[in-house]
Amino acid sequence: MWKHIVDRQQGILNFTEELISAIGKTRVLVAGAGGNGAVLDFLLRVGYQRFTIIDFDFVEATNLNRLPFTPDYIGKVKPEAWKEYLQKVNPGSSVTAYSRKITRNDESWLEENISGVDIVALGMTDFEANFLISRVCHRLRKRMVVGPGTSNCWVVSTLTNERGVSLESVAGFGTDHIDARNVDYKALLPKYMKIYMFPGRIEKLYPETLQKVRSGDIPPRNCKIFVSMVNAASCWELVKNTAVINGIKLQNTKIIEFPLIQIFDPFKGSAYYYNAAKERIGIPNWLTGRIRWYPVTT
């Protein structure tokens, strides 16, 4: 089945036999099996077939607006639901599913599992889990792709974890030498949110809706249109990273290295970059390839 799945993409720039073969062998850990986790469907259909999935939640009826499940999946644990779905599409795929809520006490467990994969896609909504996974990836020098599924934009970035840049350093947490079990996550949350609250993001919700989401009165808002954009962005970023990991040269594209974040705003029809460390917006010139940087104005 795998050969049939990857057949139609051969001949697209960068999708060489060498890269497609590497994709089929790459081990991907997807942390979070909700809207962000729907990248699994994209990954499967470009040829990835070795997955580890972590989540603790169950499939609900409201998940069907963005996940490729049918009503008979409702009530199933999400990682197991994804395993069933992925292996229906490609029976040759290997899927390890963990129903587990990641907490500050899971660092050694995460290290064991992340050390056994090639790359990580981070898609959890819980800050404590994201902090811990980011820290372990940085320690193990594992590349990690991120893209907030509730941003209502195409948005993506890669923590390559090769040049000393980490989530903790860019956010200014000051936690580098603090045991994860002793971190005050509640106190750090505003700094974390600031990184991903790129210019233009809050404009995608009505003010009263934004207030209800922030207060916890309603879950984060999402829509298949925009979640799929983030999934596509993350999948493409994972493909590019797979090439780099395997020493395959990319043509006419490159990795979006954190603290740089790539954004396409479908409401305004404009693409730009956001440097989360310097709080600057970069406007690319399609003709010249140059980026002009501006300070963020409030």
Task: Identify the meaning behind each predicted range.
Residues 1-29, 61, 257-263, 275-276, ...:
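N-terminal charged helix/coil linker that caps or initiates catalytic domains
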Residues 19-60:
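Glycine-rich adenosine-cofactor-binding loop
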Residues 42, 109, 132-136:
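A short acidic, amphipathic alpha-helical/loop segment
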Residues 48-49, 93, 140-143:
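A short helix->loop->beta-strand "cap" motif at the edges of active sites that frequently abuts
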Residues 50-91:
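Glycine-rich phosphate-binding loop and adjoining beta1-alpha1-beta2 segment
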Residues 79-131:
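A structured beta-alpha segment of the ubiquitous adenosine-cofactor-binding alpha/beta core
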Residues 116-230, 257-298:
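E1/E1-like adenylate-forming module used to activate ubiquitin-like modifiers
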Residues 230-249:
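Oxidoreductase and adenylate-handling cofactor-binding alpha/beta cores
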